[in-house]
């Protein structure tokens, strides 16, 4: 029987009926500071959590103030982090837009006038937000004696500090959600194409989520699970770091030192999330099959196939290094393998194919689909999944 490697994205948790969309988190933050219910208050007390530090987070404040102008992007925190970090870098490189030449300090009217000239530029909202925040902090924190570069570096450090707080707040939300779903409501797995996977509890799991939903609902084992982006753990010892990776893609070959702390690969190194998932692909198991030789059955040792099922992941190029490594190791393993990408609808399928073309290259993708090493199945199509699973 073939082995299974599950690669799970947030769409998996959503398919299981969990409120893990970024929009759910953003609504939770509003609820937390305006009208928290008694159950939430008791949860925070039990976990000894003080929420004052998380109020008016710069990233969530930006989203709430600019939601109408941002289109669909407002609902993706990672896009917002990317845009704001780029805006900080832009302001660092263009300090004349922020400082009055006459007084060498920021004047709000002049900043607004300068920024208004950029209204048609990409990422205008983020640039204006960072510029006006700089104006406020400059006088609140008495930066008059600082050189321009030093003052702008302090703004960058504030955004990095706020990113850490945002990650902590996300951990609080997901931990509370775990409590509601698994201790209070005791939810069960919803029907999906994964129902076709036999012995799913014994699967290896490459988990891009911070939650262990597959463990709760399918009984997958933690020792066979790699939380590649870290995991929630409010009960960790005080000397242990938050391992959750939450950031942006490294878009350039040349390392931009200012953007490094925002990038996922950097956070994976700092938080030591490791490369345990590679073992799932490297490990080769054998089974014995009878082969007919001169009219008689001869036991022969053959490699066990691997079904690599990607469920609820957009295959965003943010995670391209991980997917490239998965494909590379599967090929090196010399066992029969098949990547089975599930999709919610045709629009999502097209997006996954586009992302795979970016990650693998067009020719390689055509080759793999031609060999049936890559196939696509609708996420609710159990029969379709049964048809494509390697035996």
Identify what each model region corresponds to.
Residues 1-25, 41-47, 296-391:
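SIR2/sirtuin-family catalytic core signature
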Residues 27-41:
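Active-site-surrounding "flap" and adjacent substrate/cofactor-binding loops of secreted or lumenal enzymes
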Residues 29, 218-221, 330:
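Active-site catalytic pocket residues across diverse enzymes, especially alpha/beta-hydrolases
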Residues 39-283:
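Extended, H/D-rich, highly charged conserved domains that either
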Residues 68, 288-293, 309, 358:
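Extended amphipathic alpha-helical scaffold segments
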Residues 186-187, 207, 287-291, 316-319:
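A conditional alpha-helix N-cap/helix-loop micro-motif detector
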Residues 255-291, 365-391:
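Extended, charge-rich low-complexity interaction segments
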């Amino acid at each position: 029987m073939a082995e299974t490697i599950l690669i799970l994205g947030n769409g998996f948790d959503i398919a299981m009926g969990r409120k893990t969309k970024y929009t759910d988190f953003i609504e939770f933050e509003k609820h937390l500071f305006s009208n928290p219910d008694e159950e939430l208050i008791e949860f925070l007390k039990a976990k000894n959590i003080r929420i004052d530090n998380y109020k008016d987070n710069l990233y969530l404040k930006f989203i709430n103030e600019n939601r109408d102008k941002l289109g669909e992007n407002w609902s993706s925190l990672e896009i917002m982090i990317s845009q704001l970090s780029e805006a900080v870098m832009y302001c660092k490189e263009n300090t004349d837009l922020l400082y009055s030449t006459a007084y060498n300090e920021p004047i709000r009217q002049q900043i607004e006038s300068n920024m208004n000239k950029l209204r048609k530029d990409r990422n205008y909202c983020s640039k204006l937000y960072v510029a006006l925040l700089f104006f406020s902090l400059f006088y609140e924190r008495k930066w008059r004696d600082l050189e321009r570069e030093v003052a702008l570096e302090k703004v960058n450090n504030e955004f990095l500090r706020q990113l850490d707080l945002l990650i902590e707040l996300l951990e609080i939300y997901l931990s509370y959600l775990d409590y509601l779903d698994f201790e209070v409501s005791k939810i069960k797995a919803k029907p999906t194409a994964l129902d076709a996977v036999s012995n799913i509890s014994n699967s290896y799991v490459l988990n891009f989520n911070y939650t262990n939903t597959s463990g709760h609902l399918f009984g997958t084992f933690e020792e066979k699970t790699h939380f590649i982006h870290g995991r929630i753990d409010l009960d960790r010892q005080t000397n242990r770091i938050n391992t959750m990776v939450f950031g942006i893609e490294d878009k350039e070959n040349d390392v931009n030192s200012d953007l490094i702390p925002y990038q996922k690969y950097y956070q994976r190194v700092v938080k030591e999330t490791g490369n345990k998932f590679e073992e799932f692909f490297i490990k080769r198991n054998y089974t014995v099959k009878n082969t007919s030789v001169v009219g008689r059955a001869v036991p022969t040792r053959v490699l066990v196939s691997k079904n690599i099922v990607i469920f609820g992941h957009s295959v965003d190029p943010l995670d391209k290094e991980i997917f490239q490594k998965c494909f590379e190791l599967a090929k090196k393993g010399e066992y029969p393998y098949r990547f089975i990408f599930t999709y919610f609808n045709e629009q999502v399928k097209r997006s996954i194919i586009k992302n795979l073309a970016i990650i693998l290259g067009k020719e390689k993708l055509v080759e793999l689909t031609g060999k049936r090493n890559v196939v696509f199945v609708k996420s609710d199509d159990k029969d379709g999944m049964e048809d494509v699973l390697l035996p």
